[in-house]
Amino acid sequence: MKTLLLTLVVMTIMCLDLGYTLTCYMNPSGTMVCKEHETMCYQLIVWTFQYRVLYLKGCTSSCPEGNNRACCSTGLCNN
């Protein structure tokens, strides 16, 4: 019984997030931990003059204006 209780305590401590941190995908690759005031991830699709698609990704405090954009508020959701 003590072993089970100790296991539950250890698992709770390991899974407990002591501070809210949002992680988003960024450009050109990889991830970034957002600042405290940045509460959303975004993905913005931009068409270049050569008809190439450019994906801009990162953290933001408000969703960018316009079409071809997506915002979300959970970790790694802007893939």
Swiss-Prot record:
InterPro entries, A to Z: Snake_3FTx, Snake_toxin-like_sf
GO molecular function, one term: toxin activity
Keyword match Cell wall biogenesis/degradation: no
Keyword field: Disulfide bond, Secreted, Signal, Toxin
Superkingdom of origin organism: Eukaryota
Cell compartment(s), UniProt: Secreted
Family: Belongs to the three-finger toxin family. Short-chain subfamily.
Disulphide bonds in the chain: C24-C41, C34-C59, C63-C71, C72-C77
Tissue occurrence: Expressed by the venom gland.
Species whose genome carries this gene: Oxyuranus scutellatus scutellatus
Extent of the signal sequence: 1-21
Protein name in the entry: Scutelatoxin
GO terms under cellular component: extracellular region
Location, primary (coarse class): secreted
